[in-house]
């Protein structure tokens, strides 16, 4: 459903941001 798609997108975005932050340290 749409909620699943949004959840997946949120997870991908969170993972992307986390990776960026980790790489900055």
From Swiss-Prot:
Residues the record lists as Isoleucine amide modifications: 25
Major site of localization recorded for this protein: secreted
Record key words, sorted = Amidation, Amphibian defense peptide, Antibiotic, Antimicrobial, Cytolysis, Hemolysis, Secreted
One Gene Ontology CC term in the entry: extracellular region
Keyword Secreted found: yes
Q: Does the keyword GTP-binding apply?
A: no
Q: Which InterPro entries match?
A: Antimicrobial15
Query: So which tissues is this one expressed in?
Result: Expressed by the skin dorsal glands.
Query: According to the lineage, what is the superkingdom?
Result: Eukaryota
| Pfam families xrefs | Antimicrobial15
Q: Where in the cell is it found?
A: Secreted
The GO annotation for biological process reads: defense response to bacterium; symbiont-mediated hemolysis of host erythrocyte
What does the record note on quaternary structure?
A: Monomer.
**Protein function:** Has hemolytic and antibacterial activity.
Official protein name in the record: Syphaxin
Organismal lineage: Eukaryota, Metazoa, Chordata, Craniata, Vertebrata
């Amino acid at each position: 459903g749409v909620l699943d798609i949004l959840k997946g997108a949120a997870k991908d975005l969170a993972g992307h941001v986390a990776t960026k932050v980790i790489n900055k340290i």
